[in-house]
């Protein structure tokens, strides 16, 4: 009998599973991502996308809650996303989060 090889999961899939079970860890990951990668917005956007997915939020759900069009949210959270501060703030609000400012160390 042949054994079924286990499918390897991507890093993102593993994180998504873990964050689904522990939303506080997801928020800590997102905060850390922003603090450590403020000069690499694509990494921060990827983290926001990952956390929103782990919370079960679709693009359409985020758009509705953020009072934005789905295409705006899709572009904002896409691989080349560059959301406005207003859109970013609205997306974070749908996840129960807000932007804050801290003094750089």
Predicted features by range, described:
Residues 54-75:
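Short alpha-helical DNA-recognition segment
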Residues 58, 84-87:
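Residues that mark the N-terminal boundary/hinge immediately upstream of a DNA-recognition element
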Residues 49, 60, 89:
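Short glycine-/small-residue-rich flexible loop motifs, especially phosphate/cofactor-binding loops
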Residues 78-79:
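Residue-level detection of the helix-turn-helix DNA-binding "recognition helix"
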Residues 7-9, 100-105:
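Short, charged recognition helix plus adjacent turn
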Residues 86-102:
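DNA major-groove recognition helix of helix-turn-helix/homeodomain DNA-binding modules
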Residues 1-50, 54:
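N-terminal flexible/basic segments that precede or flank functional cores
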Residues 13, 82-85:
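Structural motif corresponding to alpha-helix initiation and N-cap regions
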């Amino acid at each position: 009998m042949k054994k079924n090889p286990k499918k390897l999961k991507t890093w993102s899939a593993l994180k998504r599973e873990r964050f689904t079970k522990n939303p506080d860890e997801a928020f800590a990951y997102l905060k850390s991502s922003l603090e450590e990668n403020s000069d690499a917005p694509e990494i921060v956007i990827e983290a926001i996308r990952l956390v929103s997915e782990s919370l079960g939020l679709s693009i359409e759900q985020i758009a509705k809650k953020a009072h934005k069009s789905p295409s705006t949210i899709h572009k904002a959270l896409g691989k080349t996303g560059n959301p406005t501060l207003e859109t970013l703030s609205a997306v974070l609000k749908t996840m129960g989060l807000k932007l804050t400012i801290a003094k750089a160390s």
